[in-house]
């Protein structure tokens, strides 16, 4: 009970004003004083985009885009505005468009660290890992030890299977983050928690995530990752509390899916079913957007609703858009539940060849390998068609 009370205190406290909200107020003051200067509108657009990350509310991206239009009216094609535009495209998961814009801007400003960061992000999300690694290396070459490069390099290390290297780089990033930047610090701590969790260091993961929640109370990224730790520890009731808090803070379909799974694990089957039903409705409504929950929808149809054809339809749509490892995994699983294991093994092998050691992906790969062994054993058993053919050709 004491643990649950402490958990509630950590997750329900709120900051009087978040860093992004303070930045929004500051930018609006700048605009009020100098409405004819484009820089104030760029500043406000950035602050609104930061608020989108704080809250996971995509409406802030739309507000930022509207503000950015004013910047371009005052100063067409200003470089800072172009960078904000790409950041917004990434935030809305329009990765191909972001890559095209970042590539064009890189030709104009070939030594800009942040533009290389955008190239890294877009290439990672599209599955272009060699190009992403080159861009991240350029960031470090241009300005060794810079914070944006460290976090991106850490993520690439994780994707390539080097969790120790990822932890080292992310810890360096945390040390380089000013203590006044509460959300940035909480975000990095949330990533550290994820990396410790992936490495099996549950105590360190929990410590990092609880520190993130002290730094930024109710932070949705920290809540989600701490819930994973609690599930691994079989503390399902606490995981449900955490995921309820996250869904309240960031009411998106993918967060509802995680909550539904936790409710199922906690034995709340009727409540879980209601959550899954609501998830499907919300997920389908947003599936036409680039920023969607299609991966969760694939796994819902494959593992919970047991509608393999629907899983494959969604997976094929997502696979047509991007080929990064998590989409390959979801596509492979959709192929598997539709009985297309040979194709599924090819997709999961492509994902694992990058180096990633994601636990769910590894479980899927093992399951596909077992299904191949079972198939081979069945085909070579006495009386099978293949055995008969073999006997006929040998004698």
Residue map of PLM features:
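Residue-level recognition of tetratricopeptide repeat
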Residues: 46, 53, 87, 121, ...
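Structural motif corresponding to the intra-repeat A-B loop/turn of tetratricopeptide repeats
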Residues: 51, 55-58, 92, 126, ...
């Amino acid at each position: 009970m004491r643990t649950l009370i402490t958990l509630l205190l950590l997750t329900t406290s709120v900051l009087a004003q978040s860093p992004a909200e303070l930045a929004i107020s500051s930018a609006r003051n700048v605009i009020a004083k100098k409405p004819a200067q484009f820089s104030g509108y760029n500043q406000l657009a950035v602050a609104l985009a930061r608020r989108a990350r704080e809250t996971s509310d995509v409406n802030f991206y739309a507000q930022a885009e509207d503000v950015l239009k004013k910047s371009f009216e005052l100063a067409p094609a200003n470089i800072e505005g172009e960078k904000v535009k790409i950041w917004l495209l990434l935030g809305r998961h329009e990765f191909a468009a972001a890559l095209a814009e970042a590539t064009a801007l890189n030709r104009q400003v070939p030594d800009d660290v942040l533009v290389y960061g955008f190239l890294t992000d877009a290439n990672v999300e599209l599955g272009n890992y060699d190009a992403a690694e080159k861009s991240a290396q350029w960031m470090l070459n241009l300005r060794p030890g810079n914070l944006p490069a460290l976090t991106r390099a850490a993520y690439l290390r994780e994707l390539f299977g080097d969790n120790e290297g990822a932890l080292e780089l992310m810890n360096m990033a945390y040390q380089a983050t000013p203590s006044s930047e509460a959300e940035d610090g909480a975000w990095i701590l949330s990533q550290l928690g994820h990396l410790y969790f992936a490495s099996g260091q549950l105590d360190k993961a929990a410590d990092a995530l609880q520190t993130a929640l002290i730094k930024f109370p109710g932070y949705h990224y920290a809540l989600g990752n701490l819930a994973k730790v609690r599930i691994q520890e079989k503390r399902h009731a606490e995981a449900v509390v955490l995921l309820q808090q996250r869904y309240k803070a960031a009411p998106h379909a993918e967060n509802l899916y995680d909550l539904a799974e936790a409710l199922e694990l906690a034995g709340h089957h009727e409540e879980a079913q209601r959550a899954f039903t609501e998830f499907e409705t919300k997920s389908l409504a947003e599936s036409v957007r680039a920023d969607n929950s299609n991966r969760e929808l694939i796994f819902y149809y494959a593992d919970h609703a047991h509608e393999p054809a629907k899983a494959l339809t969604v997976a094929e749509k997502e696979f047509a858009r991007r080929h990064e490892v998590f989409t390959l995994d979801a596509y492979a699983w959709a192929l598997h539940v539709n009985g297309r294991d040979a194709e599924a093994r090819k997709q999961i092998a492509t994902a694992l060849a990058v180096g990633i050691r994601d636990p769910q992906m590894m479980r899927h790969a093992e399951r596909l390998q077992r299904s191949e062994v079972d198939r081979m054993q069945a085909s070579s058993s006495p009386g099978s068609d293949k055995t008969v053919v073999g006997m006929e050709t040998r004698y």
